[in-house]
Amino acid sequence: MPLSRLIIQQFRNIKACDIQLSAGFNFLIGPNGSGKTSVLEAIYLLGHGRSFKSSLTGRVIQNECDELFVHGRFLNSDQFELPIGINKQRDGSTEVKIGGQSGQKLAQLAQVLPLQLIHPEGFDLLTDGPKHRRAFIDWGVFHTEPAFYDAWGRFKRLNKQRNALLKTASSYRELSYWDQEMARLAENISQWRSLYIEQMKTVAETICQTFLPEFEIQLKYYRGWDKDTPYQEILEKNFERDQSLGYTFSGPNKADLRIKVNGTPVEDVLSRGQLKLMVCALRVAQGQHLTAMTGKQCIYLIDDFASELDSQRRKRLADCLKETGAQVFVSSITENQIADMLDDNGKLFHVEHGRIESN
């Protein structure tokens, strides 16, 4: 469902704004520091309950204010509007409303508002540690497997308890009860992740080939422990090692998505522009797979569109996004940088000093 209206209050340098949106492309044009990234950040907050730039609530609430509000309205398939909103206080408390009902959970926001973010720091998906790629996988599994969210949360709680027990246990028998449930959850989580990658990777490899035709892309899922050994057996066999480490070494919390081009890790081959295109391809592939599996459309947030991309690459990305039919929000310093994306269905907003005006 596309956002039809966005209301932001007391968020960073945006005192208040109320804008009507296009179901297609929405362009935010303005100089650095004008507030265009803050609009994307506010939409992200609406879908995730947190900022993508700061984990500290106080930093996104406007100075001398005690709270912020972000509200949105969606048009569903019957063209009825569904309101959603989030209010965050400086003390860290949060209130979520969906359809006018208070007390909703952040996970429900994410279900209603599936978002894909592409921003200048997004290279970490390819160049940093496995946690970024686990988050990438888990975004997809969360939206396609209803049991995943609770199972993953329970596994993390049990893993924390197990790590505490490792410090005091005199024998493995003291952990065996916990390990049975951990193993059951781990096997389920791994199966869901593996299935997701198998289903999504054909789409991802095809789009990557379109963006980077000179390379052959390979995606391979690693589950976090030996693929031929049951997880409970791993836990028992590695008990003494885990004790000496003080934590559980193997498990779904160590899973990774290994990405190579022409058989070599991507970070050793691709330029920054090529890395950005690869990130874009993977994000678009996730959105397309989501639509194929659930009928939901993803909303794309693209910050600093022209960064690292020449005009030819910008056109490739623009054409691919247009083909999805999804709602897209793009920030850019000048209109020239988004010329390939402009059409009659798009909407242009000029942003300056936190004020947002529609053309």
UniProtKB/Swiss-Prot annotation:
Q: Does the keyword Cytoplasm apply?
A: yes
What processes does the entry annotate via GO biological process terms? DNA replication; DNA synthesis involved in DNA repair; double-strand break repair; SOS response
Any Gene Ontology CC annotation: cytoplasm
Q: Where does ATP bind?
A: 30-37
Q: What is its main location?
A: cytoplasm
A Pfam family annotated for this chain is: SMC_N
**SUPFAM superfamilies from the entry?**
P-loop containing nucleoside triphosphate hydrolases (SSF52540)
This protein is called DNA replication and repair protein RecF
